[in-house]
Amino acid sequence: VAGVIEVSDSKSVIKLSASGTVTGTLPTGDTARGIGGIAGSLTTNGAAVKTLTNSAAVTGNRSVGGIAGYFSGKDQATGKDMSDCKNEGLILSSTAADDHSLAGHYIGGIVGYAHNASLSECRSRAGYADGYTYKQEDRDKLRGRYVGGIVGYGEQSVLYDCETEANGYVLGSEYVGGIIGALNQSDTQTALLSENGTRTT
């Protein structure tokens, strides 16, 4: 489910943008699908993914990202799988995290679930496009497990020079991080959370 491309496998994705609203509901047993502002699922195999911009509000039940809900790369060591991508849309889980399925898991400003991937010079300021401001009555938006400003969950993935910018929001309930919700056999290089960025749990 996506604003521009539902599934892309081994094709270059360059200079695309999305706006408006993207909402989706997926089966909860398969990680290799997602809901994204640009793409639901991206697999690069060395193809270029760069200069993508999302301003759409994206909401889904799992693997939700401003650029891609699910992203699988090839070039982990170099930072070239995904580069120079930006999100300014509000990214939310539509459901609370479930202990017996993947519902409510993997929500990220750029990528919800990253597998064997490298991201470089990606930036997120979630909610800025619509002028969103968090209020106490918005506590029902605090849903999701593994929620990150850039990546919700990274498996064997690396981030280089990525930033969560000021005046953006990362809204979740468990394992919420300004840059990454959680990493498994992964790494960050010079990740930056701006001083005025807001993480709410």
Regions found by a protein language model. Give the residues of each.
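Surface-exposed loop/turn motifs in large extracellular/passenger domains
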Residues: 1-201
